[in-house]
């Protein structure tokens, strides 16, 4: 018996010897501690203390993945081999208003960091805007606005450019839907993202064609390798339209297989008729159901991941935009509002549209010797769009437009970081696309069937030394397009087109001091005319317009020069972006002043044309602390200011282009209280004011009405708190109101401003539950 006890004691001693203690020190690049950073390690969560430290007991020997997250900072991910020198220091890099970083992940001593010389601006705390559409969320960034078709459909605008000139990367995949229409909102659930950011430069070299205005990055969080089960629940309610939204996500790693992780996410939305300050907008209800799943395996030398998402939206189109005869149409333009309204309803009736978008992505990367990384990614997308119009008898239930767009893309790139200062990326992409108009609609499609093939190759060289970062790149693209259809007279039309272009970019940034950064970037981007611009000939049901294309249109090429100045001393933050952009063969549509009469009504004719264009403007984003004090909690009062101005006109005639955003200013006054203990961890109150000037730079001959909407002021307010309700569970509560004074106004870039006013007061209640 005594021998057995001795043996057990000996085994216990060896077991205790095999387990150690891990001490971590988490700080920022200024060597300041980050309190409250979340450490994910071996399936559990830990929080750093006020000194940025955390101690994890009973850590056995071996290699384990670790992940650290902190609001406003890039996630830190690595693999720790224990035992390790302690305390182990971890440096977090800030994301908000900082230069983007391209880092090769791994443990190779030759890997260096290269910061790119253009701005990637990140939306801070976008989950507080759950339930909003992507375009509206993006307007939090200076220089980004939206072009609307009524109150339910919106597209983002960057520096005056929108549609096919804005490239959206949905989880690193080029979003390929029917984005050519002003009434075709991006088929993306923004709640799939952990971070939404905007690149304002003409990023054609890295991402390919269509990025003249900029790039929108929809980035989900990295899969939680080595983490335990956790998730979040985000219910919300909006008074305008009585809109309810519910988003839920859950994620984790497979027990005992920490290198295998997964995530599931879904969103449900339902809203009824929206309202202006004084009347309802009938037939503006919408429904949405989305979900996504992701899984992946992470090893020391590489990672393989699969992602799938399904987006479904059904939304009605305002009755008042479809008018029966010419006299009524002209009268509506003069009155500017519907003559008759009906009681509130959740019903979705024709005219309406229904969209289903599938996205499947498979990606893998492998870490090569000496700091290289090889990445391959394949993506499949299918976009199904149906638009319903008012028709005779029971034909209203048959879609008047029924299109299926199928896209296959393949991207391969090799990224290498040298030991001293240099980095290189070389890659290529291939895309195959087919658009098919389903027969049986009884209506001539607004665009013909088409097929396209495109490929591109690029090279980017980076340089980083001391306080200097620089980058230069070159890319070649080729696109083949074959369109084939029948017009309303049963005459076949279409043809083959080939486009190719060489694009380049060069830029540099300099860290003048610990407070000041200056960067300048110039890039040439291009895009081929889309099929709708070449061959449109029919009623665009969702927009309520009769569109006419021009098959002689040429490719657009745009040269953009962007210069940024940033001052940030951790108290005062000022960022100024100034840009000039020359676009050759700029394509735009404008109202001709004529109308076309169909069975369903009378519609204004919009014609596509092109001219050389000159865009220029300034964006301002500033934050000024007014008061700051410490007692039982950290309290501060801040003033924030955002503004943007963009001008655009033809180079030769100096005429103005339609639908260019008017100058705007947004200012916020925010009081924030932070606590590290107790039930209430955060409390904040804010008030805001937005001013939009009247757009005076327009051509009356290219407008349906001879004047533009008056300038307007909107006010908003919000109050929020964050509760610690046990363990790692938190509950955020946010109450906010937009258009607080219920102002009646019209937005120049809303294509339905001819028929009705914009939205009235809207009160939101949002919850964010993390578990």
Regions found by a protein language model. Name each.
Residues 526, 583-585, 589, 637, ...:
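C-terminal beta-signal and adjacent terminal beta-strands/loops
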Residues 271, 282-284, 288, 302-367, ...:
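Flexible loop and strand-edge segments within Gram-negative outer membrane beta-barrel domains
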Residues 57, 127, 173-201:
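Short acidic/polar hinge/loop motifs at secondary-structure boundaries
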Residues 87-91, 125, 134-138, 154-157, ...:
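N-terminal periplasmic accessory domains that precede
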Residues 192-194, 205-277, 284-291, 299-302:
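Outer-membrane beta-barrel translocator/receptor signature
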Residues 27, 69-73, 83-127, 163:
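Short, acidic, small-residue-rich periplasmic hinge/interaction motif at the N-terminus
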Residues 397-413, 456, 548-554, 560, ...:
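Outer membrane beta-barrel strand-and-loop segments of large Gram-negative receptors
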Residues 579-583, 601-695:
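Gram-negative outer-membrane beta-barrel transporters
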């Amino acid at each position: 018996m005594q021998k057995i006890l001795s043996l057990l004691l000996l085994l216990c001693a060896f077991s205790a010897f095999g387990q150690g203690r891990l001490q971590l020190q988490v700080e920022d690049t200024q060597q300041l501690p980050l309190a409250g950073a979340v450490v994910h390690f071996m399936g559990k969560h830990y929080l750093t203390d006020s000194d940025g430290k955390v101690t994890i007991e009973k850590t056995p020997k071996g290699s384990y993945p670790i992940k650290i997250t902190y609001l406003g900072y890039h996630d830190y991910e690595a693999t720790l081999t224990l035992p390790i020198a302690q305390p182990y220091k971890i440096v977090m890099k800030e994301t908000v208003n900082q230069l983007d970083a391209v880092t090769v992940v791994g443990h190779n001593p030759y890997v260096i960091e290269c910061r790119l010389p253009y701005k990637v601006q990140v939306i801070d705390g976008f989950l507080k805007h759950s339930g909003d559409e992507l375009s509206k969320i993006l307007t939090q960034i200076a220089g980004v606005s939206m072009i609307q078709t009524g109150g339910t459909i919106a597209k983002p605008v960057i520096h005056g450019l929108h549609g096919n000139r804005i490239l959206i990367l949905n989880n690193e995949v080029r979003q390929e839907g029917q984005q050519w229409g002003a009434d075709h909102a991006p088929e993306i659930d923004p709640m799939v993202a952990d971070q939404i950011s905007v690149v304002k430069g003409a990023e054609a070299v890295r991402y390919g064609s269509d990025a003249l205005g900029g790039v929108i990055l929809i980035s989900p969080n990295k899969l939680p390798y080595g983490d335990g089960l956790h998730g979040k629940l985000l219910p919300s309610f909006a008074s305008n339209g009585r809109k309810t939204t519910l988003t839920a996500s859950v994620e984790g790693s497979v027990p005992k297989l920490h290198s295998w992780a997964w995530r599931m996410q879904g969103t449900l939305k339902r809203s009824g008729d929206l309202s202006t300050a004084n009347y309802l907008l009938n037939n503006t209800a919408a429904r949405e159901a989305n979900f996504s799943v992701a899984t992946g395996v992470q090893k020391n030398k590489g990672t393989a991941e699969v992602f799938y998402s399904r987006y479904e939206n059904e939304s009605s189109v305002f009755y008042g935009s479809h008018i029966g005869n010419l006299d009524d149409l002209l009268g509506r333009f003069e009155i500017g509002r519907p003559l008759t309204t009906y009681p509130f309803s959740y019903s979705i009736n024709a005219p309406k549209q229904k969209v289903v978008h599938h996205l499947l992505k498979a990606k893998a990367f492998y870490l090569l010797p000496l700091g290289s990384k090889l990445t391959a990614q394949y993506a499949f997308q299918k976009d199904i769009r149906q638009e319903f119009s008012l028709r005779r008898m029971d034909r209203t239930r048959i879609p008047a437009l029924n299109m299926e767009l199928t896209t296959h893309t393949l991207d391969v790139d090799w990224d290498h970081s040298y030991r001293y200062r240099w980095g290189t990326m070389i890659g290529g992409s291939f895309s195959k696309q087919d658009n098919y108009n389903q027969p049986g609609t009884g209506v001539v499609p607004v665009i013909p069937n088409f097929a396209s093939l495109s490929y591109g190759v690029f090279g980017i060289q980076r340089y980083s030394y001391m306080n200097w970062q620089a980058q230069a790149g070159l890319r070649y693209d080729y696109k083949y397009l074959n369109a084939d259809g029948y017009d309303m007279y049963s005459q076949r039309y279409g043809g083959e087109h080939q486009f190719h272009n060489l694009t380049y970019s060069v830029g540099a940034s300099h860290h003048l001091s610990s407070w000041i950064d200056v960067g300048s970037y110039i890039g040439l981007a291009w895009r081929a005319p889309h099929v709708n611009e070449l061959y449109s000939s029919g009623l665009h049901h969702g927009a309520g317009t009769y569109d006419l294309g021009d098959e002689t249109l040429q490719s657009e090429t745009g040269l953009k020069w962007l210069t940024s100045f940033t001052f940030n001393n951790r108290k005062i933050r000022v960022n100024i972006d100034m840009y000039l952009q020359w676009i050759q063969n700029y394509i735009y549509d404008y109202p001709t002043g004529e109308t076309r009469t169909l069975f369903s009504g009378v519609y204004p004719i919009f014609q596509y044309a092109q001219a050389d264009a000159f865009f220029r403007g300034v964006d301002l984003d500033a934050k000024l602390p007014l008061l700051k004090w410490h007692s039982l909690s950290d309290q501060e009062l801040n003033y924030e200011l955002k503004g943007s101005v963009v001008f655009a006109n033809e180079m030769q005639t100096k005429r103005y282009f339609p639908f260019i955003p008017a100058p705007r200013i947004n200012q916020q006054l925010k009081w924030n209280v932070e606590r590290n203990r107790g039930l209430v961890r955060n409390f904040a109150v804010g008030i805001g004011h937005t001013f939009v000037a009247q757009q005076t730079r327009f051509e009356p001959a290219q407008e349906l009405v001879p004047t533009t909407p008056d300038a307007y002021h909107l006010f908003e307010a919000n109050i929020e708190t964050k509760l610690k309700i046990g363990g790692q569970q938190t509950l955020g509560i946010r109450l906010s109101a937009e258009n607080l004074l219920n102002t009646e106004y019209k937005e120049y870039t809303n294509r339905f401003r001819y028929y009705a006013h914009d939205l009235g007061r809207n009160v939101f209640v949002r919850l964010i539950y993390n578990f």
